[in-house]
């Protein structure tokens, strides 16, 4: 998509959000970011999202490198859309061997960075263990079902504790 077409779409609000990190290289994304910054300086405000899809995940070269963090009230389609529309989203890219980069309003970036440093890796460890047990179950491990059942709800409990929802 040409810069002029992107500009026309964003200036006329034909899109609900701008896929800021949609390329597969720093070069492609740098141009998108520069265009977005230019539009912001001209008064055009539009929410950002990271990559909306991944191609060629077999070798995983580009899989999971670009993402969107959305601060929605609930994990529902409507709440996610509403959060993005109100600029409660952050575009993020993370290339192998490099520090991640976050793009959005300062407040959103600061919170996303905090979660990246203190929450996401711990949450991922819990999910990894559940995934490992699911794989073992499918492979015929007779004990995996009981161990998986014991893990049930641990990610929800962790999130509730981390965000102070379990304190009454």
Where is each model-derived feature located?
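Charged catalytic cores and adjacent phosphate/nucleic-acid-binding surfaces used
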Residues: 2-168
């Amino acid at each position: 998509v040409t810069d002029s077409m992107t500009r026309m779409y964003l200036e006329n609000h034909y899109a609900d959000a701008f896929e800021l990190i949609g390329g597969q290289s720093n070069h492609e994304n740098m141009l998108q970011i520069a265009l977005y910054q230019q539009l912001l300086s001209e008064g055009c405000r539009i929410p950002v999202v990271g990559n909306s899809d991944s191609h060629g995940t077999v070798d995983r070269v580009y899989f999971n490198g670009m993402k969107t963090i959305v601060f929605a009230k609930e994990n529902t389609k409507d709440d996610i859309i509403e959060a993005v529309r109100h600029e409660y989203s952050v575009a993020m890219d993370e290339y192998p061997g490099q520090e991640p980069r976050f793009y959005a309003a300062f407040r959103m970036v600061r919170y996303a960075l905090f979660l990246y440093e203190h929450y996401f890796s711990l949450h991922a460890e819990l999910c990894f263990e559940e995934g490992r047990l699911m794989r073992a179950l499918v492979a015929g491990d007779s004990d995996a079902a009981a161990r998986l059942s014991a893990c049930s709800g641990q990610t929800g409990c962790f999130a509730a504790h981390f965000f102070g929802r379990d304190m009454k």
